[in-house]
Structures are given as C-alpha cells and as structure tokens.
C-alpha cells in the first residue's frame, strides 16, 4: 500500500510546533485594512494555535506524517 500524501494546501497554511500543536497565521490581512485600528493590524501579524477537534482532523487526515 502506498504512503499517504500530505495535502499541498495544508503544507502552505499550517506548521507543526515541537509540542505537536498546529500553528496558523491569522486571517483578515488581504484587503479592507483601512477600517481596522493599528492595534488590530498589529495583533493580526502574530500566529495563533489551532486546538480542538479541527486540529486533530487536520493532522490525522491531511498531514499524516507531519510537515517536513
């Protein structure tokens, strides 16, 4: 049976931390940034951690071997 492939879209959007959590960049920085405050834009630059069942499903089905 062949090895499972990691989805290319997931490789571009998520990364695994050393403890096994999913790191993802925040959405909402493509356009319409004039209406946001400087504080909102500054906070959107940081990464966030995806937790819960969504993260488990992504790791299990879309990243079977993690991201190398």
UniProtKB/Swiss-Prot annotation:
Cellular component terms (Gene Ontology): cytosolic large ribosomal subunit
Coiled-coil zones: none
UniProt entry tagged with the keyword Thylakoid: no
GO molecular function, one term: structural constituent of ribosome
Gene3D superfamilies: 4.10.410.60
One Pfam family here: Ribosomal_L35p
Keywords: Ribonucleoprotein, Ribosomal protein
InterPro entries for the chain: Ribosomal_bL35, Ribosomal_bL35-like, Ribosomal_bL35_CS, Ribosomal_bL35_sf
GO biological process: translation
Alphabetical list of NCBIfam families matching this protein: rpmI_bact (TIGR00001)
UniProt family annotation: Belongs to the bacterial ribosomal protein bL35 family.
Protein name, per record: Large ribosomal subunit protein bL35
Organism: Orientia tsutsugamushi (strain Boryong) (Rickettsia tsutsugamushi)
């Amino acid at each position: 049976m062949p090895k499972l492939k990691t989805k290319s879209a997931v490789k571009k959007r998520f990364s695994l931390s050393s403890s096994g959590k999913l790191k993802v960049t925040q959405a909402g920085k493509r356009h319409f940034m004039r209406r946001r405050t400087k504080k909102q834009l500054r906070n959107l630059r940081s990464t966030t951690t995806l937790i819960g069942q969504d993260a488990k499903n992504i790791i299990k089905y879309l990243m079977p071997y993690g991201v190398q």
